[in-house]
Swiss-Prot record:
<feature type="domain" description="RRM 3">
    <location>
        <begin position="461"/>
        <end position="535"/>
    </location>
</feature>
<feature type="compositionally biased region" description="Basic and acidic residues">
    <location>
        <begin position="681"/>
        <end position="694"/>
    </location>
</feature>
<dbReference type="GO" id="GO:0005681">
    <property type="term" value="C:spliceosomal complex"/>
</dbReference>
<dbReference type="InterPro" id="IPR012677">
    <property type="entry name" value="Nucleotide-bd_a/b_plait_sf"/>
</dbReference>
<dbReference type="InterPro" id="IPR003954">
    <property type="entry name" value="RRM_dom_euk"/>
</dbReference>
<feature type="compositionally biased region" description="Low complexity">
    <location>
        <begin position="143"/>
        <end position="168"/>
    </location>
</feature>
<feature type="compositionally biased region" description="Gly residues">
    <location>
        <begin position="633"/>
        <end position="680"/>
    </location>
</feature>
<feature type="modified residue" description="Phosphoserine">
    <location>
        <position position="116"/>
    </location>
</feature>
<dbReference type="GO" id="GO:0005730">
    <property type="term" value="C:nucleolus"/>
</dbReference>
<dbReference type="InterPro" id="IPR034235">
    <property type="entry name" value="Nucleolin_RRM4"/>
</dbReference>
<feature type="domain" description="RRM 4">
    <location>
        <begin position="553"/>
        <end position="628"/>
    </location>
</feature>
<keyword id="KW-0238">DNA-binding</keyword>
<dbReference type="InterPro" id="IPR034230">
    <property type="entry name" value="Nucleolin_RRM1"/>
</dbReference>
<feature type="compositionally biased region" description="Acidic residues">
    <location>
        <begin position="26"/>
        <end position="40"/>
    </location>
</feature>
<keyword id="KW-0488">Methylation</keyword>
<dbReference type="InterPro" id="IPR034234">
    <property type="entry name" value="Nucleolin_RRM3"/>
</dbReference>
<dbReference type="GO" id="GO:0003677">
    <property type="term" value="F:DNA binding"/>
</dbReference>
Length: 694
C-alpha cells in the first residue's frame, strides 16, 4: 500500500513533464511486465548504436549538429510530445537525476534494469533534444562560440531523466531521493532558466527521426562525466546571449548608417555633377549654325581648334544647336582658344567665353531676363535684320528655330538696360511686321510677376479694343479716343481688319481714364470692350471687366452640320489658319464639332466675337476656347480618378478624393477624411482603418 501511495505522487510529477501510460498505477506485477516489454524492445538497440557511432563526431563538431537533432521529438516517441510545453523549470533537474539513475543501474538491483536503462536513455535523449532546441532558439540570433556548442551537444545527453524515472517506477529508495532532489533542483533551476523560459513554445518541431535516433544513443560514461558541465554551459549561454543582445544593435547600426549615408550622398553627387562643368578648362561657344546636325557641329569644332594645335577633350552641343561647351586638357590651351573669339566657324562668327558655374549663370540669367523681351506672332519668314530694324536699340536678336532651322514665329530681343526693354514693350506692342501684329512680353521671373498682378490691373499706356466692327476705321477710333497718340488695327493677309485694335495714350492715367469712360461704347453697331494691353492679357488672365480667360489660339465649334467640310469651316472664320472636324472612326461621318486654329489668341478671340450666334451651312454653332493640353481637370468626380480636393482621386472609390486615398466623403488628405480611409469603397463601404479628426 505504501508503494501505491507513492505512485500517484510520482504520477503528478510526470504530468508536469510528460504524461505516461496509465498502466503505471495498477500494481507491481504490471510494472515488471512493463519492464519485460521494454527489454523486448531492446532488440533494436544494436543497429541504433551503429548509427550513433557514425553520427557521434558530427554531434560534437558545431551548432549545426545540434540543430539537426532538434526535430527529433515528434518522430521517436509520441508520448514525449507534451514535454515541449513545460518551462525550463522542469528541465534543469536533469543532471543530478541522471546521476541517481546511473548509480541505481550500476548497483544492479536486477538484470532487467540495466536493459531498460538504455531504452530510458532513448527517451531522455529525446527530451534532451528539446532542451537543446530551447538553447538553439536562444542561440539562433547571436553567433555562439564553437566550444560551448560542442560542450552542450556532448553534455546534453543525460538531460530530462525525470520524465523517464516515474514512467518506469524503479524503486522506493530512488523515488524518495528523486523527490527530494527535484525539490532542491527546482529552486535552483528557476533562477537559471528565468530569462529563457518561453523559448520552447516559439518553435514548432518538424519530424526528422533519423538524426534523433543517431544522437539519442550516447554512452553511460558520458552521462556521469558531463553532469557538471551541463550547468556551466547554461551559464555560458546566458552570458553569450546577453553579450549578443548588447552587440546586436551595434552591428546593425553601422549597416543602417552606411545605407542612410549612401542615400544622402547620392543626391549630392548628382548635384555636383550638374552644377559644375565637366571640365575645369571649359569654354562656352555661341552663334553656332543650327541647321547642321550635332555630329557635324562636334567634328567642325574639334577641327577648328585642332588647326591651332589645341587639344579638345569633349564637345557638348546645346539642344537648340546654337551654343555648346568645349572642354580642353589644360588652362594654357583654354587661354589660347579664347583668342579665337570672333573667328568664323561654318560661315558664322563664333563667340567664346569661359564657362560659368550654375550659381553665377542663374544670377546672370535674372539680370539678362529683366532686359529681354519675348516677341511672338511673327511672320515665319522674318529675319534677324528685319527685327533689328523694328527694335533699333536692341543689343541682340535671337529667333526661335525648330529642328529644321526654320523660324517658329517667335524671337528674344535683348536690350542694354531694363529701362530700354520696358520702353520698347510699351511702344512696340501690337506693331505689325509683314501684316502680323507682334505680341510682346517680358521673360523669366518678371513675366511671372507681371502676370500675377492680374489682367488689366497693371497700369499701361495701351488699351486693347475688342469686339471691334470690321467696318470701323482708325479715324473712327481717333474720334472716340481723342488723347490717343497711336492707333493700330491689325489686318490679315487679304488686308481685312481682324476685329481688334491697339490704342496708345501718352500716360497710363490717360489710358485708365479712357477705359473707364469708353468701355462698352457702340462703334458701327458693336459694343466695344476695352482692357489694358499687358502680358497678363496675353496669358489669358481674367480681367475685372471681362475678356477671355483661356490662353488658347484654337476655337472649339459645336453644332456643325454633317455637310460642313474642313474647308468651309476654315473659311467661316476670319484669320483662321487651319480647321479640323472630328469624325467617327468607323463610319467617317462628322460628329458635329470641330476645331479652328488661329495664329494668336487675340485672333481667336476676335473671330469668336464675330461669329457669336452665327450659322455655318444653316446650323447655329456654339463657340468656346479650346483648353490647352494639361489644363483639363485630372479625374475627380464619383468613382475616383486623379483629382479631388482631399487626396488623389474623386469623391469616393478609386484612389482617394474628398476622403483621402480611398473612399468616403470626408475632407481629408492621404489618411482618409471623416469617412475616408485607405481602401476604396466610395460612399458604400469604406475599407481599411477609419481615421477621425476631432
Amino acid at each position: 500500500m505504501v508503494k501505491l501511495a507513492k505512485t500517484p505522487k510520482n504520477q503528478m510529477k510526470q504530468k508536469k513533464m510528460a504524461p505516461p501510460p496509465k498502466k503505471v498505477e495498477e500494481s507491481e506485477e504490471e510494472e515488471s511486465s512493463d519492464l519485460e516489454e521494454s527489454s523486448g524492445e531492446e532488440v533494436m538497440v544494436p543497429p541504433k548504436k551503429q548509427q550513433k557511432a557514425a553520427v557521434t563526431p558530427a554531434k560534437k563538431a558545431a551548432t549545426p549538429a545540434k540543430k539537426a537533432a532538434t526535430p527529433a521529438k515528434k518522430a521517436v516517441t509520441p508520448a514525449k510530445k507534451a514535454v515541449a510545453t513545460p518551462a525550463k523549470k522542469a528541465v534543469a533537474p536533469s543532471p543530478k537525476k541522471a546521476a541517481v539513475v546511473g548509480k541505481g543501474a550500476k548497483n544492479g538491483k536486477n538484470a532487467k534494469k540495466e536493459e531498460s536503462e538504455e531504452e530510458d536513455e532513448d527517451d531522455e535523449d529525446d527530451e534532451e533534444d528539446e532542451d537543446e532546441e530551447e538553447e538553439s532558439d536562444e542561440e539562433e540570433e547571436p553567433a555562439v562560440p564553437v566550444k560551448p556548442a560542442a560542450k552542450k551537444s556532448a553534455a546534453a545527453v543525460p538531460a530530462k531523466k525525470p520524465a523517464v524515472v516515474p514512467a518506469k517506477q524503479e524503486s522506493e529508495e530512488e523515488e524518495e531521493e528523486d523527490d527530494e532532489e527535484e525539490d532542491e533542483e527546482d529552486d535552483e533551476s528557476e533562477d537559471e532558466a528565468m530569462d529563457t523560459t518561453p523559448a520552447p513554445v516559439k518553435k514548432p518541431t518538424p519530424a526528422k527521426a533519423t538524426p534523433a535516433k543517431a544522437k539519442a544513443e550516447s554512452e553511460d560514461e558520458e552521462d556521469e562525466e558531463d553532469e557538471d558541465e551541463d550547468e556551466e554551459d547554461e551559464d555560458d549561454e546566458e552570458e553569450d546571449e546577453e553579450e549578443s543582445e548588447d552587440e546586436k544593435p551595434v552591428k546593425e547600426a553601422p549597416g543602417k548608417r552606411k545605407k542612410e549615408m549612401a542615400n544622402k550622398s547620392a543626391p549630392e553627387a548628382k548635384k555636383k555633377k550638374t552644377e559644375t562643368p565637366a571640365s575645369a578648362f571649359s569654354l562656352f561657344v555661341k552663334n553656332l549654325t543650327p541647321t547642321k546636325d550635332y555630329e557635324e557641329l562636334r567634328t567642325a569644332i574639334k577641327e577648328f581648334f585642332g588647326k591651332k594645335n589645341l587639344q579638345v577633350s569633349e564637345v557638348r552641343i546645346g539642344s537648340s544647336k546654337r551654343f555648346g561647351y568645349v572642354d580642353f586638357l589644360s588652362a594654357e590651351d583654354m587661354d589660347k582658344a579664347l583668342q579665337l573669339n570672333g573667328k568664323k566657324l561654318m560661315g558664322l562668327e563664333i563667340k567664346l567665353e569661359k564657362a560659368k558655374s550654375k550659381e553665377s549663370l542663374k544670377e546672370n540669367k535674372k539680370e539678362r531676363d529683366a532686359r529681354t523681351l519675348f516677341v511672338k506672332n511673327l511672320p515665319y519668314r522674318v529675319t534677324e535684320d528685319e527685327m533689328k530694324n523694328v527694335f533699333e536699340n536692341a543689343l541682340e536678336v535671337r529667333l526661335v528655330l525648330n529642328k529644321e532651322g526654320s523660324s517658329k514665329g517667335m524671337a528674344y530681343i535683348e536690350f542694354k538696360t531694363e529701362a530700354e526693354a520696358e520702353k520698347a514693350l510699351e511702344e512696340k506692342q501690337g506693331t505689325e511686321v509683314d501684316g502680323r501684329a507682334m505680341v510682346i512680353d517680358y521673360t523669366g521671373e518678371k513675366s511671372q510677376q507681371e502676370s500675377q498682378k492680374g489682367g488689366g490691373e497693371r497700369e499701361s499706356k495701351t488699351l486693347i479694343v475688342n469686339n471691334l466692327s470690321y467696318a470701323a476705321s482708325e479715324e473712327t477710333l481717333q474720334e472716340l479716343f481723342k488723347k490717343a497718340t497711336s492707333i493700330k488695327m491689325p489686318q490679315n493677309n487679304q488686308g481685312r481688319p481682324k476685329g481688334y485694335a491697339f490704342v496708345e495714350f501718352p500716360t497710363a492715367e490717360d489710358a485708365k481714364e479712357a477705359l473707364n469712360s469708353c468701355n462698352n461704347t457702340e462703334i458701327e453697331g458693336r459694343a466695344i470692350r476695352l482692357e489694358f494691353s499687358s502680358p497678363s492679357w496675353q496669358k489669358g488672365n481674367m480681367n475685372a471687366r471681362g475678356g477671355f480667360n483661356q490662353q488658347s489660339k484654337t476655337l472649339f465649334v459645336r453644332g456643325l452640320s454633317e455637310d460642313t467640310t474642313e474647308e468651309t469651316l476654315r473659311e467661316s472664320f476670319e484669320g483662321s489658319i487651319s480647321a479640323r472636324i472630328v469624325t467617327d472612326r468607323d463610319t467617317g461621318s462628322s460628329k458635329g464639332f470641330g476645331f479652328v486654329d488661329f495664329s494668336s489668341p487675340e485672333d481667336a478671340k476676335a473671330a469668336k466675337e464675330a461669329m457669336e450666334d452665327g450659322e455655318i451651312d444653316g446650323n447655329k454653332v456654339t463657340l468656346d476656347f479650346a483648353k490647352p493640353k494639361g489644363e483639363f481637370q485630372r479625374g475627380g468626380g464619383f468613382g475616383g480618378g486623379f483629382g479631388g480636393r482631399g487626396g488623389r482621386g474623386g469623391r469616393g472609390g478609386g484612389r482617394g478624393g474628398f476622403g483621402g486615398r480611398g473612399g468616403g466623403r470626408g475632407f481629408g488628405g492621404r489618411g482618409g477624411g471623416f469617412r475616408g480611409g485607405r481602401g476604396g469603397g466610395g460612399d458604400h463601404k469604406p475599407q481599411g482603418k477609419k481615421i477621425k479628426f476631432e
